[in-house]
Amino acid sequence: MKKILSVTSLLLTLVMLFALVSCNTVEKTGAWENATYLKDTELGKGEKTVEVEVVAEEQSVTFTIHTDKATLGEALLEHGLIAGEDGPFGLYVKTVNGILADYDVDGYYWGFYKNGEMMMVGVDSAAIADGEHYELKREK
């Protein structure tokens, strides 16, 4: 009898654990299908801390990045969060967090903002300071 009770309680515990884990799963769909991160994530070690919110298709994820790098582009490249091509005006960002926005391919681009205001420089030229908040938004 004790053995049956032990097995039953073990099975019930496993079922409850599986149910809790399943409820916390975020599905990769649409633009987020190839995303590296689906949940807010903290990365790096360094003196400065900046937040970078990535927005695409009504979904977003925020990266809290600790870094000693001088520019946002360097900090994002250090963690593999952005990729693109060097052009006449600096880095042309095409991929953020694994999400593609290539104007020549799909008509989308990455808008770059600081505290809700569009930046007049690219990520590779944006000097960073502790406590700043940036947004990279997939726009058409």
Task: Describe every region a protein language model picked out.
Residues K2-L12, L17-K140:
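Ubiquitin-like/PB1-type beta-grasp interaction modules and other compact soluble beta-rich domains
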